[in-house]
């Protein structure tokens, strides 16, 4: 079968791998027919980062946990890339009861069992059954397990009754192309807080977490936030934020300052710039008791946080990987019920066969598609 592999910066290729097979009665084989590019994938695609990050790890300039996720030479190719997909079930082990051949499903980016202590606590990305290290995941290379990337002809899914989440009937799969990661990640940054503070105000700092920030802004509007301010320097993303109902604010490219913001305080702030300055500004923008959710990558081990300001303002900062599997049922139900137009964030829909070229494009949200089996 074919799998899209990252060979090096700006270079991706289809490469052959053995077809996956059912290895146990709880396995499933699925065929992805829609895949989207995670915001984080653009880092190794568009930049020469492997050797600089290796040096940074050696010199203590990058937190050592990065090696546990991406390897001692982070993002060194070739490896299968991609960890967001909508797939069709094509084969099932004998003990799988929750899915049927032909079902359309979301596959979470992190591989989890559903039964261990971590999974029962909702920390499915930290599953102790599937991971011997930091993560067990699709699309991050061998350090995160043998699963390969999701831009592939077929995938083996262990613990299928737990892992596979059916897409509601009538819901366009293109609308939930990023539900495996970025769309769910955005959900957890705003919706739980707005459920606690109905009508609350939301600030989104857009940037490196390109689609996450936009999904978060749109979900906040759909959840009934009283104010949703989206701050960014890039025209394409500002226009998308406005289409989703947020108020867009252009700021200069470069280090973000508190004076760049609209001049009010917020119940919820989503930090998507992946910078220490963004963390500082987001925290200082909060109302008393406000929540800042950081959705970026913060590689240096000494990223500064204004702890005393947080103390005085009773602020909460949440940083952590996304635990998608527990989120998916509520997210999919919300999108179907509220007709949330997540596809507005998609800036390029490309043919599946064109993946090596399409994945190199500099665009906010890339989605690949091909026909379902038997589709006309």
Residue ranges and their predicted role:
Residues 20-35, 50-120, 148, 168:
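Glycine-rich beta-strand-centered segment in the early N-terminal region that forms part
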Residues 235, 276, 280, 325-376:
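C-terminal hydrophobic helical "lid"/dimerization subdomain
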Residues 296-314, 330-331:
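Rossmann-fold NAD(P)-binding glycine/threonine-rich loop
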Residues 63-83, 113-205:
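NAD(P)H dinucleotide-binding glycine-rich loop of Rossmann-like/cofactor-binding domains
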Residues 104, 166-254:
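Mid-domain Rossmann-like dinucleotide-binding core that forms the NAD(H)/NADP(H) cofactor-binding site
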Residues 286-287:
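Helix-to-beta-strand junctions that scaffold the AdoMet/dcAdoMet cofactor pocket
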Residues 290-291:
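Glycine-centered, small-residue-biased loops immediately flanking beta-strands
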Residues 259-269:
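A short acidic, Gly/Pro-enriched loop at the edge of an enzyme's catalytic core
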